[in-house]
UniProtKB/Swiss-Prot annotation:
Function: Part of the high-affinity ATP-driven potassium transport (or Kdp) system, which catalyzes the hydrolysis of ATP coupled with the electrogenic transport of potassium into the cytoplasm. This subunit binds the periplasmic potassium ions and delivers the ions to the membrane domain of KdpB through an intramembrane tunnel.
Membrane topology qualifier: Multi-pass membrane protein
The protein's assembly and partners: The system is composed of three essential subunits: KdpA, KdpB and KdpC.
Annotated family: Belongs to the KdpA family.
UniProt GO cellular component terms: plasma membrane
GO molecular function: P-type potassium transmembrane transporter activity; potassium ion binding
UniProt key word Membrane: yes
Transmembrane segments: 6-26, 62-82, 132-152, 175-195, 253-273, 283-303, 327-347, 356-376, 379-399, 416-436, 483-503, 526-546
Protein name: Potassium-transporting ATPase potassium-binding subunit
Length: 562
């Protein structure tokens, strides 16, 4: 079993690097603005029809365009979800959502969170799934990548004032990257048996003579961008545990690769654009080391399972509760770490049924900001925030002004870095406290004790860090949780994006200084170790008290009793 686990991890990482490296080269060309003759006429036609000028923007113009674009997306999706009962492509005649659930869902999909307080097969029409959720899966992913593009340009350029054009970036990312790759992935999913139709639900009689309804729908097209764009919202309530969404071990492996593909490729692109591939490789090494350790811990915890099972007559202590037998413990553990290291949130098992230790690792990966590969775009700019913090700490230790890639990191940069790093922990801890201190918040907790606390902490961590997965023992389809989590998702998304763009605006104007004798090398093993230590230190200082009240206490209860 140990050999199988390491073989699975090694094969996953190998295929990931083989696929992401050439994609990184293509993304580097997009960042640098190289024209692509194949679609240049299509692009020019879009600018003429829309009346948008493709002149470059400064930092605040870029931020305003991104913010307005996403606010408009929230409004349009909210209206669609509220009125779906009166619109076509609704063969099951499903009514519109309640206003608070529609608001929660609109904010969720526009912010790339895809938190779902509903089950798709009995709540959403095909039109809402296709024109609403699937469209936002593309656009929210493009938003994150565009912000990463702007920050990469800020490091690569010097003595400049502009970061690119937000509209050009959004269109080119969608047209050249997301749509073609999503089409290929969708065809792979269809070949594996994922549904893709507009038929009405099938009403059948089982062998036992019981009536059963089989949901249909355009699943593969949404499933492809769900994983590629690290969105995570499932067409069905069971998400990727549903056999119509993720039917085989091969489709499961492809989903995991798709989740990490663009985040990993962006690291390669970063190194190419700044003119030093070692910088991108250092980020990948730091991310990979944390990721591999996390996977090993979850696999160990789930294989160890519950020590109380064998004395009760079970064949094994291993924890198969809430898992699909077609995937098994190893692939399920890998998927859980992939989806929470990235801001995806798709699940192929019930995270609420993991052991206390096995469930704590996905929770912790979200709490450190999902910087271990992370979401499309957000993973890279999140890790670069920790890079800036690391060089600042190193500068304090040796008494030098911190610098990164030849650019001095000043007071404003560090203020924005601190703001971006601290905004999500603040939301998580305050939101959890609010839920536990109010009657409306406590009413949703279905499990007592440490596990009930973990469910609330997981929900706020997932929402604030734009992940979307859940410990599903919490009743969240209430006005209190829908509004609380909507606020957490919105602030968690744009409370990081706006400081990142402010940092980019500051860095792009600076001159690049040649490296001196006292300059900290940022492409070697020493810096990789410092970076990992900084990520772990910030995560530990922020969340250890909360984790001690939840999963740590639950783990000790199980094993000390044994």
């Amino acid at each position: 079993m140990v050999a199988s686990g390491f073989l699975l991890i090694a094969s996953f990482m190998l295929v990931l690097f083989v696929l992401s490296r050439p994609l990184g080269g293509f993304l580097a060309r997009l960042i640098e603005g190289e024209p692509f003759s194949a679609l240049q006429k299509v692009e020019a036609g879009l600018w003429r029809c829309s009346g948008v000028k493709n002149a470059e923007m400064n930092g605040w113009q870029y931020a305003l365009a991104i913010l307005c674009f996403n606010l408009l997306g929230i409004v349009l999706l909210f209206v669609l979800l509220m009125t779906q009962g009166s619109l076509p492509l609704n063969p099951e005649h499903l009514p519109g959502m309640s206003w608070h659930l529609a608001l929660n869902t609109a904010v969720s999909f526009v912010t790339n969170t895809n938190w779902q307080a509903y089950s798709g097969e009995n709540t959403l029409s095909y039109l809402s799934q296709m024109a609403g959720l699937t469209v936002q899966n593309f656009l929210s992913a493009a938003t994150g990548i565009a912000v990463a593009f702007a920050l990469i340009r800020a490091f690569a350029r010097h003595s400049a004032t502009t970061l690119g054009n937000a509209w050009v970036d959004l269109v080119r990312i969608t047209l050249y990257v997301l749509l073609p790759i999503a089409l290929i992935i969708a065809l792979i999913f269809v070949s594996q048996g994922v549904l893709q139709n507009l038929d009405g639900y099938l009403h059948i009689t089982t062998l036992e003579g019981v009536q059963q309804t089989l949901p249909m729908g355009p699943v593969a097209s949404q499933e492809a961008i769900k994983v590629l764009g690290t969105n995570g919202g499932g067409f069905f309530g069971a998400n990727s545990a549903h056999p119509f969404e993720n039917p085989t071990a091969f489709s499961n492996f492809v989903q995991m690769l798709a989740i990490f593909l663009i985040p990993c490729a962006l690291c390669f692109a970063f190194g190419q654009v700044v003119g030093d591939n070692r910088q991108g490789h250092a980020l990948i090494w730091a991310m990979s080391l944390i990721f591999i350790v996390a996977v090993v811990v979850v696999m160990y915890a789930e294989l160890a399972g519950n020590p109380h099972l064998s004395p009760l007559g079970a064949d094994s202590n291993s924890n198969m509760e809430g898992k699909e037998s077609r995937f098994g413990i190893l692939a399920t553990s890998l998927y859980a770490v992939v989806t929470t290291a990235a801001s995806c949130g798709a699940v192929n098992a019930m995270h609420d049924s993991f052991t206390a230790l096995g469930g704590m690792i996905p929770l912790w990966l979200m709490q450190i900001g999902e910087v271990v590969f992370g979401g499309v775009g957000s993973g890279l700019y999140g890790m670069l925030l920790f890079v800036l913090l690391t060089v600042f700490i190193a500068g304090l230790m040796i008494g030098r002004t911190p610098e990164y890639l030849g650019k001095k990191i000043d007071v404003f940069d560090m203020k924005m870095t601190a703001l971006a790093i601290l905004v999500t922990p603040t939301i998580v801890l305050l939101g959890t406290a609010l839920a536990l201190c109010t009657e409306a918040g406590r009413a949703g907790i279905l499990n007592p004790g440490a596990h009930g606390f973990s469910e609330v902490l997981y929900a706020l961590s997932s929402a604030a860090n734009n992940n979307g997965s859940a410990f599903a023992g919490l009743s969240v389809n209430t006005p209190f949780y829908n509004l609380l989590l909507a606020a957490a998702m919105f602030i968690g998304r744009f409370g990081v994006i706006l400081p990142v763009l402010a940092i980019a605006s500051s860095l792009v104007a600076k001159k690049r200084q040649p490296a001196g004798n006292g300059t900290l090398p940022t492409g070697g093993p020493l810096f990789i170790g410092l970076l990992i230590g900084t990520v772990l230190l910030v995560g530990a200082l922020t969340f250890i008290p909360a984790l001690a009240l939840g999963p740590v206490a639950e783990h000790l209860q199980v094993w000390l009793a044994h």
